[in-house]
């Protein structure tokens, strides 16, 4: 799934700006639905994998189009926060119904069919997708292109490092709870609340918007991350683990809105914003694999340390990109 997701969004930088976005969104919805149904109706493992690959293609393209549209809005940080909150709220329905209701009765195929039905319902909103996006919406003039490519590249690498680090932590939060002596029921109850705290973090970003400027939210996110890693260290107790998960989901969803907003802020062409989806997909693949490898060689503390280093690298990279962008000369129309 993530392979198809990452490949399509990486290639989109070459062609997305040249196609009708509404038509591309309709096509992506169709591919997404057809791929999910293919995976649900096939018994051969190879065909199921092919279905999931193309499901990733459809989902990645839809997400890339959404990122591009939001990135060119007048308040991307705010709108990314709203979008992330909507993802969590809508996704929570399937996240609950899949393993609790649909899976036990209809199996994996039933879950895929339910996902296809869900995508079909949401695809109705595609009719409001703009056909194209103009990147020339800067107020007071446009930044010159000098150094633009390097700044965007730095911001994308920063996002990749950042999400790799966070994915590496998130993939093993259950094991951290078990190491602290918590029961599966306790861990499940705590993790079930992450939808609420995640939405709160995303809506916090939507409410704050750009009131604190471009830099301060990143410092706040880094502070929240340090608190999270500190709480997850040393086999946390029930209270400590609960606070850590609250801090993790609040910080992740709050900060993600600003990470995405910052990349689109420095991408004055509007062409490269779609690569944020590739960076997120890459991080989602590499992070858990990296943490699993490190855990086999050492212990969970080293996993947390390496993840923290990657998150800090992302923080350093995105703030450097923002400083470079703010220092670029402006040309008036």
List PLM regions with ranges:
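Hydrophobic core of transmembrane alpha-helices in multi-pass small-molecule transporters
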Residues: 47-61, 160, 240-254
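Structural signature of the two symmetry-related core transmembrane helices
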Residues: 23-37, 216-231, 308
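Helix-to-loop junctions at the C-terminal end of transmembrane segments
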Residues: 7-21, 201-214, 295-296
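Intracellular juxtamembrane helix-capping segments at the cytosolic ends
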Residues: 60-74, 253-267
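C-terminal membrane-cytosol helix-exit motif in multi-pass small-molecule transporters
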Residues: 95-106, 110-138, 317-322
